[in-house]
């Protein structure tokens, strides 16, 4: 009799624990679904970025490059990420000096450096407790479009796909597991990338692949719309 009672109590305990575990899973799953983030659509606005007409193999010195932060503004980010908060941007310098050029002449030249050739955006998406999402845009070169075509093929090899080339002449994935694109449009060669901690609505793929394949193309379209 005591053995039967002990067995019954054990079974009841197991059932109670199972119900608690199941309830916890359901609550966490529901919380995750509520935190899923919708991806909007690119909505380019504002005036085109001023780029000079470059022909005959001309190359624009890095210190004359446009400000990278002028290609994407906060309203354009809000169009791509409805509900985004705490958007901040930071200009960062970029060096255009190759090691070959450095070997020939190691002296410092103002023309080799852009003080705002890269822009880093940080933001907080729904479900994040701090600004954990980042998007960055970096100018790689500005030159005669014919020169850019050959240069991009040489320095930015990767998986060619039209998925990211929304408005660009060409985009490549530089690595299958990397969340970045290298693109060209007219006289501009650029790279976009970033990261996030959230999951996205209606997308079964892991966040890094969704970021690369669905989010970044919207930024590419926003950027290339500024190049006339």
Task: Give short role names for the model-derived ranges.
Residues 1-36:
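Hydrophobic single-pass membrane-targeting/anchoring helices
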Residues 28-228:
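A small/polar (G/S/T-enriched), proline-flanked helix-loop surface module common
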């Amino acid at each position: 009799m005591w053995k039967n009672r002990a067995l019954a109590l054990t079974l009841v305990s197991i059932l109670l624990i199972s119900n608690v575990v199941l309830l916890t899973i359901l609550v966490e799953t529901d919380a995750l679904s509520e935190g899923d983030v919708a991806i909007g659509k690119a909505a380019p606005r504002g005036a085109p970025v001023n780029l000079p007409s470059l022909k005959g193999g001309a190359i624009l010195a890095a210190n004359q490059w446009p400000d990278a932060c002028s290609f994407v503004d906060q309203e354009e980010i809000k169009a791509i990420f409805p509900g985004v908060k705490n958007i901040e941007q930071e200009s960062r310098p970029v060096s255009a000096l190759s090691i070959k050029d450095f070997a020939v002449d190691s002296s410092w030249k103002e023309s080799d450096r852009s003080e705002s050739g890269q822009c880093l955006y940080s933001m907080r998406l729904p479900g994040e407790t701090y600004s954990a999402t980042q998007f960055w845009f970096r100018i790689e070169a500005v030159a005669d479009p014919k020169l850019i075509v050959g240069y991009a093929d040489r320095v930015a090899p990767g998986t060619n796909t039209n998925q990211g080339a929304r408005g660009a002449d060409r985009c490549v994935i530089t690595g299958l597991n990397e969340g970045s694109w290298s693109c060209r449009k007219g006289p501009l060669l650029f790279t976009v990338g970033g990261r996030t901690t959230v999951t996205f609505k209606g997308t079964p793929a892991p966040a890094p692949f969704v970021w690369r394949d669905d989010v970044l193309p919207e930024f590419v379209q926003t950027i290339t719309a500024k190049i006339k």
